[in-house]
């Protein structure tokens, strides 16, 4: 049964504010930044904290779609376009799904065959204004995730960029510091020995350290899906629906996962009820199984999302060679270490 997206028709974005709680105990470890540490800030309600940044959440929304045991997308999503990078022996190295800069990864740029040159040629950007429809069609062909998580093809042309159409972050409000500490014990020689060169710098001796964790009155996962941007790609009804469903599938898969962000940072949903949208009252985030349903005896998943993937990747007898050439595909390149 198709997922009803009609409540979204008159809206330009879809917002969720998902209440979370610490899975065990009260303390949690937020993300940290070099020379800054935890990102605390003041709001009218008091002291708040950035628990997980937008860039980190983009990686996590990708990770729930990736199967590390097979180095491929999770089975219901296989067929979606991305670039796989292998070494000269044919072993998997990385992919555009996993790379921080996606298509602009140096492992793709410096690989063979020259995928970047092929992409640049298909975009047709050299010494010309950006042909936006041609640009997004090319990105769809090689890495559909870039249309959701954004991409900046700086090494090709500084004008080739797409903003995120799904963005998420986690904040905590009413935070307080939970100070603690620990010690690294040296079982052989607890005291330092400067004369012998056995100092803390080299890792010798007992090394005490401070540790700051946090408690919070409220923890919230904020998510925004830019429906106007997705529709503005002009890629047709099927691709537009695929992108919206894929964005929602990523969010649902993340909140259904253990949400263990770090060693001392595990969350779960605070409320067990339906996840309703903040700005579209009649829309609730579907359950994960609603997107993919079940795997049939023929190996195909019967849900609408995998069905759309098959429709948009499989060749149809009536299609022209030009249309077939624009379809999503898995591209494999080789990077020599």
Question: What does each of the following model-derived ranges do?
Answer:
Residues 49-51, 59:
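Active-site scaffold segments
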Residues 1-30, 35-49, 70-73, 78-85, ...:
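Basic polyanion-binding and macromolecular-assembly surfaces
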């Amino acid at each position: 049964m198709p997922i009803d997206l009609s409540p979204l028709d008159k809206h330009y974005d879809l917002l969720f504010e998902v209440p979370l709680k610490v899975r065990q105990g009260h303390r949690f470890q937020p993300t940290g930044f070099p020379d800054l540490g935890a990102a605390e800030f003041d709001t009218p309600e008091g002291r708040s904290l950035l628990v997980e940044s937008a860039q980190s959440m983009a990686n996590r929304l990708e990770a729930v779609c990736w199967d590390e045991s097979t180095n491929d997308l999770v089975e219901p999503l296989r067929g979606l376009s991305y670039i796989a990078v292998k070494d000269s022996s044919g072993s998997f190295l990385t992919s555009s799904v996993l790379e921080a800069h996606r298509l602009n990864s140096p492992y793709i740029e410096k690989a063979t065959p020259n995928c970047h040159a092929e992409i640049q040629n298909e975009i047709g950007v050299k010494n010309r204004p950006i042909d936006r429809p041609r640009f997004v069609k090319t990105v769809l062909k090689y890495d559909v995730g870039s249309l959701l998580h954004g991409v900046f093809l700086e090494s090709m042309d500084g004008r080739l960029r797409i903003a995120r159409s799904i963005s998420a972050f986690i904040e905590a409000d009413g935070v307080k510091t939970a100070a603690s500490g620990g010690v690294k014990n040296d079982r052989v020689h607890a005291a330092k020995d400067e004369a012998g060169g056995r100092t803390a710098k080299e890792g010798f001796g007992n090394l005490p350290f401070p540790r700051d964790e946090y408690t919070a009155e409220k923890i919230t996962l904020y998510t925004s899906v830019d429906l106007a941007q997705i529709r503005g790609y002009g890629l047709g009804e099927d691709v537009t629906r695929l992108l919206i469903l894929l964005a929602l599938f990523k969010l649902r898969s993340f909140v259904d996962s253990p949400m263990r962000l770090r060693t001392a940072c595990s969350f779960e949903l605070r409320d067990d009820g339906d996840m309703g949208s903040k700005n579209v009252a009649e829309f609730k985030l579907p359950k994960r199984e609603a997107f993919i349903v079940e795997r049939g005896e023929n190996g195909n998943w019967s849900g609408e999302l995998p069905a759309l993937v098959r429709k948009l990747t499989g060749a149809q007898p009536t299609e022209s060679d030009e249309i077939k050439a624009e379809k999503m595909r898995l591209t494999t390149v080789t990077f020599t270490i």
